[in-house]
Amino acid sequence: MAIEVHGVCPYFEVYDMPNSIRFYRDHLGFEIVSTSPHRGGDKDRFHWCWLRLGTAEIMLNTAYEIDEERPPLENYLRERKHRDTCLYFGCPDVDGAYAELVAKGVVVDRPPTVAPYGMKQMYLHDPDGFGLCFQWKAV
């Protein structure tokens, strides 16, 4: 018997939850599906959230559960350890996604380019340095 699976939902630990929420929700268009209880007055301050864009899902969790434990600056070594992590999103209109992201001020590391294996791909990083690629088979 094969195990029935209906998707995968990667889990990322983030340095600054409100900043990550603004990036994924306001720039990329993800919707918030669920969160842990809100903390303080900021509606984007919580420890954990589940996000969805189309059929793609991700979960974010704060790397520091207690604000006082969070260093004033992002730990470069922590970010460097996941520099090789990249999520690949199926995106039929890579050029349109690129234009929309650039219009919103998002820094794109590599604009849409056709790779030698026939995929049109655009690469960027989220605020914590996790790689994101929007891709589709080139025509």
Language model regions located:
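Extracellular/periplasmic catalytic domains that process cell-envelope and extracellular macromolecules
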Residues: 52, 80-81
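Core segments of cupin and vicinal oxygen chelate
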Residues: 2, 11-58, 65
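Short amphipathic alpha-helices within nucleic acid-binding modules
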Residues: 22-23, 95-100
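Short, charge-rich, low-complexity interaction segments located
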Residues: 67-71
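N-terminal beta-strand motif that seeds the catalytic metal site of vicinal oxygen chelate
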Residues: 1-21, 84-87, 135-139
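Short, P/G- and charge-enriched loop/turn segments at secondary-structure junctions
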Residues: 72-78
